[in-house]
From Swiss-Prot:
Primary role: Necessary for efficient RNA polymerase transcription elongation past template-encoded arresting sites. The arresting sites in DNA have the property of trapping a certain fraction of elongating RNA polymerases that pass through, resulting in locked ternary complexes. Cleavage of the nascent transcript by cleavage factors such as GreA or GreB allows the resumption of elongation from the new 3'terminus. GreA releases sequences of 2 to 3 nucleotides.
Pfam families in the record: GreA_GreB (PF01272), GreA_GreB_N (PF03449)
Family per record: Belongs to the GreA/GreB family.
The name this protein goes by in its record: Transcription elongation factor GreA
Keyword Transcription: yes
Gene Ontology biological-process entries: DNA-templated transcription elongation; regulation of DNA-templated transcription elongation
UniProt source species: Clostridium beijerinckii (strain ATCC 51743 / NCIMB 8052)
InterPro entries registered for this protein in UniProt: GreA/GreB_C_sf, TF_GreA/GreB_CS, Tscrpt_elong_fac_GreA, Tscrpt_elong_fac_GreA/B, Tscrpt_elong_fac_GreA/B_C, Tscrpt_elong_fac_GreA/B_fam, Tscrpt_elong_fac_GreA/B_N, Tscrpt_elong_fac_GreA/B_N_sf
Coiled-coil regions listed in the entry: 49-75
MF (Gene Ontology): DNA binding; RNA polymerase binding
């Protein structure tokens, strides 16, 4: 019997997924059911793009619900009181100097299920996140990227 993947998450990440799941189950499902009813009223299903679109939306939504339920069932929540303030780990905020762009950036290290790189939430499994985890202030890490190697110096660590 294979084991399910465990999802390391912060408390905030779990709450966000629970909120999305609740929305999909209570609001989105009703919207889709209504769209399907309306589309069925148009008659012939063989050329009914509204019906096809609603059924595709339904399939995507049901798939996402299953995915969220699985992630929440297998979530391992990081105890924020146990997040060290001197070593980078899931739940840490890390201020780094990015040598490629010569700028300071602050990342939140999160589990893969709650990663949002556009908002500086990077997964502990991503190349940069993985390189930072376990390091301390003053450490310099090198991360291999498609166009070469990026260097980051850890300037500060705090709890998220």
């Amino acid at each position: 019997m294979s084991q399910s993947k465990q999802y390391v998450m912060t408390y905030e990440g779990v709450k966000k997924l629970e909120s999305e799941l609740e929305y999909l189950k209570t609001v989105k499902r009703k919207e889709i059911t209504e769209k399907i009813k309306i589309a069925l009223g148009y008659g012939d299903l063989s050329e009914n793009s509204e019906y096809d679109e609603a059924k595709n939306d339904q399939a995507f939504t049901e798939g996402r619900i299953i995915q969220l339920e699985n992630m929440l069932k297998n979530a391992v929540v990081v105890d924020e009181s146990e997040i060290p303030s001197d070593i980078v780990s899931v739940g840490s905020k890390v201020k780094v100097k990015d040598y490629e762009f010569d700028e300071e950036v602050e990342y939140s290290i999160v589990g893969s299920a709650e990663a949002d790189p556009m908002n500086f939430k990077i997964s502990n499994e991503s190349p940069v996140g993985n390189a930072l985890v376990g390091k301390k202030v003053g450490d310099v890490v090198e991360v291999t990227v498609p166009d070469g190697v990026n260097k980051f110096e850890i300037l500060g660590i705090s709890r998220s």
